[in-house]
Design a protein with these regions (language model features):
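Residue-level signal for inorganic ion chemistry
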Residues: 21, 46, 57, 91, ...
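Solvent-exposed alpha-helices and their adjacent loops that cap or buttress functional pockets
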Residues: 34, 75-77, 110, 128, ...
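An extended, acidic
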Residues: 143-263
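DPxDG-like acidic metal-binding loop motif
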Residues: 77-136
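Small-residue (primarily alanine) positions within well-ordered alpha-helices
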Residues: 10, 14-17, 116, 135, ...
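Generic detector of well-ordered alpha-helical packing
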Residues: 47, 51, 70, 87-90, ...
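N-terminal subdomain of lithium-sensitive/metallo-dependent phosphomonoesterases centered on the IMPase/IPPase/PAP
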Residues: 1-88, 250, 257, 261
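Short, solvent-exposed loop/turn motifs
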Residues: 113, 141-143
Length: 263
């Protein structure tokens, strides 16, 4: 399938970083005998992957800014374009050898995400979206699920990290949603949760206190698959607030309504 030059640049970078992570994943089990070994190793794997992404993206688009989870912000001469990158979304899964993690690359132009790539090297699933051109998984067009009854829906969420977030608020939200849906899941990688909504595997997803690199690529993925994404508490931009809820138009609206009442 033919994609734009920008998408090809993103895919090439994601695949190269993915090969690095896949090699590192194979080493994790050998480090489990050491308490500090695996965590330190994963930190290095994360940084290696980000540096690969930075090198490849900067070479192809030298003026663009770069925001990465590990290295922070690197200013570019082109102030209108910025890469927003998570080199390893699902770090805890990776640390435990669970193959639910991803590389997430979003391209923002003047505040709007215009392209996204999410790649899970463990199963070679490559999600691609470009503004106005649709969303794809391994070249197959994606559409969000069409269910219109919450009691038929499977929904994913994220858990607040230890020492961060409002755990009581989350418990209220989880209880309110759990009482209304067919199933509730927690997979541990925000970018893939968003991608799963785009692919129709999940009907909806919500999570609070995310960072831009968690959301950027997944947000355009859901929208290009026909879904709706917003802040939880307002119709605003989740990329700005860090609080995301999504699904098809109906599911998004119902989830947002329940979550706002529970907050």
């Amino acid at each position: 399938m033919l994609y734009s030059a920008t998408i090809n640049v993103m895919v090439k970078a994601a695949r190269r970083a993915g090969r690095s992570l896949k090699r590192d994943l194979g080493e994790i089990e050998h480090l489990q005998v050491s308490l500090k070994g695996p965590a330190n190793f994963v930190s290095l794997a994360d940084k290696r992957a980000e540096e690969i992404l930075y090198q490849d993206l900067a070479k192809a688009r030298p003026g663009y800014g770069f925001v990465g989870e590990e290295g922070g912000t690197r200013e570019g001469s082109d102030k209108s374009h910025t890469w927003i990158v998570d080199p390893l979304d699902g770090t805890t899964n990776f640390l435990h050898g669970i193959p639910q993690f991803a590389i997430s690359i979003g391209l923002v132009r003047e505040g709007t995400v215009i392209a996204g790539v999410i790649y899970n090297p463990a199963n070679d699933e490559l999600y691609i979206a470009e503004r106005g051109k649709g969303a794809f998984l391994n070249d197959q067009r994606l559409r969000v699920a069409g269910r219109r009854q919450l009691n038929e829906c499977v929904v994913a969420c994220g858990l607040p990290h230890i020492g961060r977030g409002d755990h009581e608020e989350f418990r209220r939200e989880m209880t309110a949603i759990q009482d209304r849906v067919a199933g509730l899941r927690r997979f541990g990688a925000a970018s893939l949760d968003l991608a799963f909504v785009a692919a129709g595997r999940l009907d909806g997803y919500w999570e609070r206190n995310l960072s831009p690199w968690d959301i950027a690529a997944g947000q355009i993925m859901v929208r290009e698959a026909g879904g709706t994404v917003s802040d939880i508490d307002t119709p605003g931009d989740a990329l700005v607030t860090g609080h995301v809820v999504c699904g098809n138009e109906f599911v998004h609206g119902e989830l947002a309504k329940v979550l706002r009442k529970a907050a």
